[in-house]
From Swiss-Prot:
InterPro entries linked: Euk_RNA-bind_prot, Nucleotide-bd_a/b_plait_sf, RAVER1_RRM1, RBD_domain_sf, RRM_dom
Phosphothreonine modified-residue sites: T469
Name used for this protein in its record: Ribonucleoprotein PTB-binding 1
Modified residues (N-acetylalanine): A2
Organism in which the protein naturally occurs: Mus musculus (Mouse)
Length: 748
């Protein structure tokens, strides 16, 4: 009734002023956000009773002072007159947590057993303190109790849930309380509901101390005023506007730490009844070009504390769904991403935006593709993009697994050293329309999709060069053998190449892939010394040509005990026209390990595959020869073929599945099946052939010096104790390679 008296008798207003306030002009100037119809007294009574019942519905009690040996059954017997929903006894602390049917039973149990005795020990019974009570404020006044329960129920089991109504009008004051069974449910509800838009309002959620919440403190004394005019900063004008009924004890505009206005203000009145009368009068009042919206704050804290809490809640609501750091702009994103990722981000809408109808960062996509092929357009745009960020990339480039960054080697205005399909390898036998190229850097990886050596020259692609041994691959992906070699007598300077996979250490020269655009994957440099020591002719473009060694001519398909040796010499002559002074041709020696091979060719034996030296004239001819000669079926126990052939096959694993002579047979027939000569594709992904003078590079076991030059490569396995035979019960290459690898790994 105090609220009615204060509203009826308004000391600051005279009857004339009150009449003036009720004039249509003044009424028209008020535009509250929601006009609620008046309620009948019965509805008001029901709402108030529900709020009081829910407020008192604290049914959890805490019993202290229990004996140390008390049991759960004793507590049930003690509270036998009540309906227990939950009971937990802590014997170490002598306490019991009990949940009864409702708040009335809890109040009755407290009145009955508080300060009573159990086994000569005095008990203390009281309500359990709760830390899972939330106050949800800034609700729409038209929100019903059922809608409020539906809003807060999804986050966990509710202990209490009620709205706070005006005792005079019965309308909601725009805030309510929700208590959960568990604190984590309340924390989840606070996190999800804070800043959530509900109709025209944004929810504010606060923790509430249930111990300090009384029926009198359910009603708030603070008001929140928003919808202020833009840039409004006159606190005195706001105070006068809301002092028509009662003068507030606290009035302040919200400002951030940077001094920026937040667009709302907080006012505090002496009593909850004064605050209710001021809210009813000022809600929708015109101030400047805006109509104020006045709502109740959460009850409890004073006005100054509530202002700080609302500022923090507004900042949290504005940052809802965002990270702790500000969102980076497009320029920062492109700078942090690599050139390839930035290019893909920019090109995807252009290349594929026509189907989706969306415009990308570069605008609407063209009606036709930029270039005839996506690979060509990507490469050209990548070069253009890199030329713009040259200074940045040079300061940040770091060597990767395969060496320096490929983008860091681009120079401004430099042209690519090869076409998108790669450069052809140097050597004789090129087609007339393709002149031989000399001194080109050679990538480490072999041609994966290129045709075999026997088919390259008819196609006009020219013969490839030697490659280091990569991991094994399917038969259809094997590369070509080492054939046509340059006959020039002087080195030529080579421009630095660009690789898509990075630049490796600077001491490799290997052949180039004409199909996968892997030009200069490993740049060429510092191989002058190693090329003369049996690198399979990889450095022949930088040495003066030497006369080839004389070798007897071998008829194609020859047989006999010396056919293998002759074929070996013939192949060495055809493959290696440039002889080495340090590798005299001695194919008949039984111990091929005596040759002066470099110690750093050991890693080439990894996954290596021997050539077929007994194939006779199936060498680098352009013809598809018929099946292998009869020398395949002859034993190699003596004679001229016993020396190099036995060593060539005994210690050379050919692949994961075959070894020795069986691999040569299978390799020959597989290559014949795919339309290439056996010798033409015998050295692809799975193998390497003999060196410049016909001696296999596979004869050399890696020595200790290998660690200094090629410590980053896997060591090669020792020669298999089973030789070239792999039978049904043979251990095979896999087990032997694992054993030898473990033994050699201990050396490093």
């Amino acid at each position: 009734m105090a609220a009615d008296v204060s509203v009826t008798h308004r000391p600051p207003l005279s009857p004339e002023a009150e009449a003036e306030a009720e004039t249509p002009e003044t009424v028209d100037r008020r535009a509250p956000e929601q006009e609620l119809p008046p309620l009948d007294p019965e509805e008001i009574r029901k709402r108030l009773e529900h709020t009081e019942r829910q407020f008192r519905n604290r049914r959890k009690i805490l019993i202290r002072g229990l004996p140390g040996d008390v049991t759960n059954q004793e507590v049930h017997d003690l509270l036998s007159d009540y309906e227990l929903k939950y009971c937990f006894v802590d014997k170490y602390k002598g306490t019991a947590f009990v949940t009864l049917l409702n708040g009335e039973q809890a109040e009755a149990a407290i009145n009955t057993f508080h300060q009573s005795r159990l086994r000569e020990r005095e008990l203390s019974v009281q309500l359990q303190p709760t830390d899972a009570l939330l106050c949800v404020a800034n609700l729409p006044p038209s929100l019903t109790q059922a809608q409020f329960e539906e809003l807060v129920r999804p986050f966990g089991s509710l202990e209490r849930c009620f709205l706070v109504y005006s005792e005079r009008t019965g309308h909601s004051k725009g805030y309510g309380f929700a208590e959960y069974m568990k604190k984590d449910s309340a924390a989840r509800a606070k996190s999800d509901l804070l800043g959530k838009p509900l109709g025209p309002r944004t929810l504010y959620v606060h923790w509430t101390d249930a111990g300090q919440l009384t029926p009198a403190l359910l009603h708030s004394r603070c008001l929140c005023v928003d919808h202020l005019p833009p840039g409004f900063s006159d606190v005195d004008a706001l105070r006068r506007a809301l002092s028509v009924v009662y003068t507030p004890t606290f009035c302040q505009l919200a400002c951030g730490q940077d001094g920026q206005l937040k667009g709302f203000a907080v006012l505090e009145y002496e009593t909850a009844e004064m605050a209710e009368a001021a809210q009813e009068r000022a809600d929708g009042q015109a101030l400047g070009d805006s109509h104020l919206r006045v709502s109740f704050c959460a009850p409890g804290p004073p006005g100054r504390s509530m202002l700080a809490a609302l500022i923090a809640a507004q900042a949290t609501a504005l940052n809802r769904g965002k990270g702790l750091l500000p969102e980076p702009n497009l320029l920062q994103l492109l700078n942090n991403l690599g050139p390839s990722a930035s290019l893909q981000l920019l090109l995807n809408p252009l290349l594929h935006g026509g189907a989706s109808g969306k415009q990308g960062l570069l605008g609407a996509p063209p009606a036709m593709p930029l270039l005839s092929g996506p690979a060509l357009s990507t490469a050209l745009l990548q070069l253009a993009l890199q030329s713009q960020s040259q200074n940045q990339s040079q300061g940040q480039k770091k060597p990767g697994i395969l060496g320096d960054s490929p983008l860091g080697t681009l120079q401004a205005g430099a042209q690519p050293s090869n076409s998108l399909l790669g450069e052809l390898s140097a050597g004789g036998g090129l087609a007339p329309e393709l002149p031989p190229r000399r001194g080109k850097p050679q990538p480490l990886l072999p041609p994966l999709l290129g045709p075999s050596g026997g088919d390259r020259e008819p196609m006009g692609l020219g013969p490839p060069a030697t490659q280091l041994t990569p991991p094994p691959a399917p038969v259809g992906l094997r590369g070509s053998n080492h054939r046509g070699l340059p006959k020039d007598s002087g080195p030529l300077p080579t421009p630095p190449g660009v690789s898509l996979l990075g630049e490796p250490p600077k001491d490799y020269r290997i052949p180039l892939n004409p199909y996968l655009n892997l030009h200069s994957l490993l740049p060429s440099s510092n191989l002058a010394g190693k090329e003369t020591r049996g690198w399979g002719g990889s450095g022949r473009g930088r040495r003066p040509a030497e006369p080839p060694l004389p070798s007897p001519a071998v008829p194609g398909g020859g047989s006999g005990s010396n056919n293998g040796n002759k074929a070996f010499q013939m192949k060495s002559r055809l493959l290696s026209p440039i002889a080495s002074n340090r590798l005299p041709p001695e194919p008949g020696l039984p111990d091929s390990y005596g040759f002066d091979y470099p110690t750093d060719v050991g890693p080439r034996r990894l996954f290596s595959h021997p050539r077929e030296p007994t194939l006779g004239a199936h060498g680098p001819s352009r013809h598809k020869m018929s099946p292998p000669p009869s020398s395949f079926n002859e034993p190699r126990s003596g004679g001229g073929s016993g020396g190099p052939l036995s060593h060539f096959y005994s210690g050379s694993p050919t692949s994961y599945f075959t070894s020795g002579l069986q691999a040569g047979l299978k390799q020959s027939h597989l290559n014949k099946a795919v339309g290439s000569s056996p010798m033409g594709s015998s050295e692809g992904l799975l193998g390497l052939g003999p060196g410049p003078n016909g001696h296999s590079h596979l004869l050399k076991t890696p020595l200790g010096g290998q660690k200094r030059s090629f410590s980053h490569l896997l060591p090669s396995p020792e020669p298999s104790p089973e030789g070239s035979y792999v039978g049904q019960h043979s251990q095979g290459l896999g087990g032997h390679y694992a054993d030898s690898y473990l033994k050699r790994k201990r050396i490093f």
